[in-house]
Amino acid sequence: MRYRIIGIIYLICAITLFAREPFLNTLTVEQETARYALSGNWDAVIRTGKTALAQGIDFYNLRYRMGIAYYHLGNYHAAARHFYRAYRINDTEPLLKEYLYWAYRYAGHEADARVLAAGFTQELKRKAGVPDQYPGDYLSISFNAGFPVDKSFTDSYVNDTGLAVNGSQFLSKTLNYADVGIQKSLSPRLSAYVSYARLKKTSYLYAQENGYAVVKPDYETNLNQVYISGTYHVIRGTDLTIGAHFINIFYQRDRYVFNGLEGRIVTDEISDNDKLVFMSVRHRFPYVTTGITSIFSNLNQKDQVQGDLQLTFYPLGNLNLYGGCILTYLHQNSGENTVITELLLGGKLLPVLWAEAIYSTGDLHNASRYQGYVVYNGMDVITRRIGGRWIIPVSEDLTVRLNYAYQKHESSFHPENTGLTETNRIHYKSHSITGALQWNF
């Protein structure tokens, strides 16, 4: 009796198993996916394909149809993965190449698209709509204006540090810059980016030297910046980028000169240079892009070593929704260590509007962002940034970008003797607005 019960249990389990997992072979999968594809039932194509792959059934038409199904559903990450598997089986089918090319483009994988299109015939390029120039080349011009939330916040400035302590304190008032950059593909695998920026900053400066105090309500600093980077597409999905950022800083410095029993203040024109170099590796997985960046810099007469870990997620397999984070560790030779966290959430709100929300926290003083492109080498400290970005593709050739950031600053009196403690800590807030035009060519 016991063996009979065990046999019945095994029979029920077997029936349940076969009911849940229909028996498939290459022929039945071919027939079912073809029928579903002809009727436009893309969900059924994907469902059947997943079941077949789970049972070890894999062939060209299956991957090809699954790629088409995901493509029509707007999941270009999954579409590119299946098209590429089909491409590895048969790389001579022109229509497959066309689908794979546009899946790469719509997924934002421009380098993969360039390398693939380099092997197209002229007839296939014309038929697939591949542009004569490599996709991703552009010229950009941007303008920025930064100003405090409370424009009178320096009116009540007081410093109780004894005059015997030499040092200075800066409070940022306005910041304006213009930036022009060009991105150019030199070959299917190699691209370069070069930009020049001119920046003007005004600060409230309080300085003490040899028992005298100097106040400059509109202290001016001017910067010229050159940024250069090159990106090499190593293998499918992987890019290696190296670059450098050079900053020339012009400002005035007062010093007290003794002449017998009397003295006078002499103003010197000073030119300093800040610089950094970086190396970055990025790899694109389906639905996830990862990046690691190492930055070595010398800013404000200090050496910095910075490491960035970046993760970006595309849950829909396209650019309609994405989010991610950048985790930064910054070490300075003065023994200072800082952790910075930046969060990003973006997506497509309208057919011609993408929006992004950005939140950053951590001491940004002497830190760099976005592969060394943005450098925070001001004398005060930004401790938090909350902002947004609006991206408006006006046409295939023109894109408008608008950025806004609400920033929290922290300023202290810095003694020249680094062994002394910083004093007179002040907190204030500012707005930063940037507008940019990008011409694609």
Predicted features and spans:
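Bacterial Sec-dependent N-terminal signal peptides
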Residues: M1-T26
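Alpha-helical protein-protein interaction scaffolds
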Residues: R20-Y134
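Transmembrane beta-strand segments that form the barrel wall of outer-membrane beta-barrel proteins
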Residues: Y64, L139-F147, A164-N166, A192-R198, ...
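Long amphipathic alpha-helical scaffold segments
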Residues: A107-F143, T154-D160, A164-G167, N176, ...
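Strand-connecting loop/turn motifs
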Residues: G136-Y138, S185-R189, I235-D239, H283-T289, ...
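Surface-exposed strand-loop-strand hairpins of Gram-negative outer-membrane beta-barrel proteins
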Residues: F147-G181, T202-E209, A213-D218
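Residues on the lipid-exposed face of transmembrane beta-strands in outer-membrane beta-barrel proteins
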Residues: V180-K184, I228-Y232, M279-H283, L309-F313, ...
